[in-house]
Amino acid sequence: MAESLYAFIDSPGGIAPVQEGTSNRYTFFCPESFHIPPHGVVLLHLKVSVLVPTGYQGRFMALNDYHARDILTQSDVIFAGRRQELTVLLFNHTDRFLYVRKGHPVGTLLLERVIFPSVKIATLV
């Protein structure tokens, strides 16, 4: 049985994520254009939710200065079997307005395989 990451477009403007090659990394995009004021904060709803396959967990985070300088980001863990709406918290640490355009990459999801080994009792006596 194939394992798939399910992405749901929750409302108009939501943009489907793109897998980077055959890697465990998926890129998410800004659904609308906006400005972040100087020293401001924006909570951006991506209008997309995901369902992580069984046996995996996802680590979702905003893209850092690799794509947009002077923006600090946060991350979240997404567990398998639960549909999670995605949001990105963006901070502007500059003295100028930052413009983010629709379609700009703003988030990434890394899938990690999770195993649950059984416990064995060990003793040195």
Curated annotation (Swiss-Prot):
GO biological process: nucleotide metabolic process
Compartments reported by the entry: Host cytoplasm
GO molecular function term, any single one: dUTP diphosphatase activity
Effect of residue 91 to S: Complete loss of transformation
Motif (PDZ-binding): 122-125
Subunit structure: Binds to human MPDZ.
Protein name in the entry: E4-ORF1
Organism whose genome encodes this protein: Human adenovirus D serotype 9
